[in-house]
Curated annotation (Swiss-Prot):
Presence of keyword Cell inner membrane: no
SUBUNIT field: The basal body constitutes a major portion of the flagellar organelle and consists of four rings (L,P,S, and M) mounted on a central rod.
Domain of life: Bacteria
Principal location: periplasm
Covalent S-S links between cysteines: none
Organism of provenance: Pseudoalteromonas translucida (strain TAC 125)
Protein name listed in UniProt: Flagellar P-ring protein
């Protein structure tokens, strides 16, 4: 009895893993099973006067007419306010076959005011290798709206220069997948972790058999798989639905210095530390005074400058962190002193420099 038959028998007998776990498919992806980016250049026509008359749009328009056997004089500059040059891009999902359709996004690359009401003409979508994998065409769905008055006033809602065409491109060429090329498949963890990799390896080995899975590093787990296509699909279908318990995430504090957003992981702990944080406000005002002499005197008008400096210090409070303080205690203590997000970022950075944070402080 081969490995695959034993594997199927064990599944039918009712293999169960602990609840409160994650499926393999939710924390990893199969190596080689990926989407591919496509991009193309095309023209959108039928715009209600919101197109453009740039040089490259004019050239593209003439090239399109030439492809239909219509030749315009070189000196002629057509008025094409209802045409816009656009970039078209799409994601080609794995295993998508010729004849199937994919969604495409159309974006203006010139000075067009809006793509609302326009239609994309036949556009070749190419991959990074230069081959055409899909052809796009169709009427755009544009969520934005723009309007401009004769006096130059303008109102723009959302983004009228970007639109989508659901199922707007037909796949012409399939991307070859390495899914069936080897005697094994490889799961790559979305978040590499040595503990998670070993737990996933053990979960598969406990089900399929010893040495069926091998953790190669913190991200990749190689699993022996049947060569037969039908068996491999069934085998992978069962494997990716197995449940196991991943390792806890690393203790991290994520700080976005631009927006003031702060995310603190549940595993963040603090060493003993005392903190005091007060606000010091310095205000400097400059005032010009004019000294005007009396009439019929020999004095000169003099301008003097007076500086007024005011310093205000807010009351500050000190608080102490005991060993092993958790996220809840940290947030509660920070809120008690009324710290703003900017103050909190300064406090966290100071704690990290003092070695009081058991975890990573990541500033993005």
């Amino acid at each position: 009895m081969n490995v695959f038959k034993v594997f199927c028998l064990m599944v039918l007998l009712g293999w169960q893993l602990p609840a409160m776990a994650e499926r393999i498919k939710d924390v990893s992806m199969v190596e080689g099973v990926r989407s591919n980016q496509l991009v193309g250049y095309g023209l959108v026509v039928g715009l209600p006067g919101t197109g453009e008359q740039s040089r490259f749009t004019e050239q593209s328009f003439k090239g399109m007419l030439n492809s239909f056997g219509i030749t315009l004089p070189a000196s002629l500059k057509p008025k094409i306010k209802n045409v816009a040059a656009v970039a078209v891009h799409a994601e080609l999902p794995p295993f998508r076959k010729p004849g199937q359709t994919i969604d495409i996004t159309v974006s203006s690359i010139g000075s067009a005011g809006s793509l609302r009401g326009g239609t994309l003409l036949q556009t070749f979508l190419k991959g990074v290798d230069g081959n055409v994998y899909a052809i796009g065409q169709g009427s755009l769905i544009v969520g934005g709206l723009g309007a401009e008055g004769l006096d130059g006033s303008k109102v723009v809602i959302n983004t009228p220069t970007v639109g989508r065409i659901p199922n707007g491109a037909t796949v012409e060429r399939a991307v070859k997948s390495p899914f069936m090329q080897n005697d094994y498949i490889t799961f790559n963890l979305n978040r590499p972790d040595f503990t998670t990799a070993k737990r996933l390896e053990k979960t598969i080995n406990d089900l399929v058999g010893p040495n069926s899975a091998q953790a190669l590093d913190a991200a990749s787990i190689r699993v022996i798989a049947p060569r037969d296509a039908s068996q491999r699909v069934s085998y992978l279908s069962t494997l990716e639905n197995l449940e196991f318990t991943p390792a806890d995430t690393a203790a991290k504090i994520i700080v976005n210095s631009r927006t003031g957003t702060i995310v603190i992981g549940k595993n963040v702990k603090l060493q003993p530390a005392a903190i005091t944080h007060g606000g010091l406000t310095v205000t400097i005002a400059e005032q010009l005074n004019v000294s005007q002499p009396n009439a019929f005197s020999d004095g000169d008008t003099v301008v003097t400058q007076q500086s007024i400096i005011d310093i205000k210090q807010d009351d500050s409070r000190a608080f102490v962190f005991n060993p092993g303080v958790s996220l809840d205690d940290l947030v509660r203590a920070i809120n008690e002193v009324g710290a703003a997000p900017g103050d909190l970022m300064a406090i966290l950075e100071a704690l990290k420099e003092a070695g009081a944070i058991n975890g990573q402080l990541v500033v993005i």
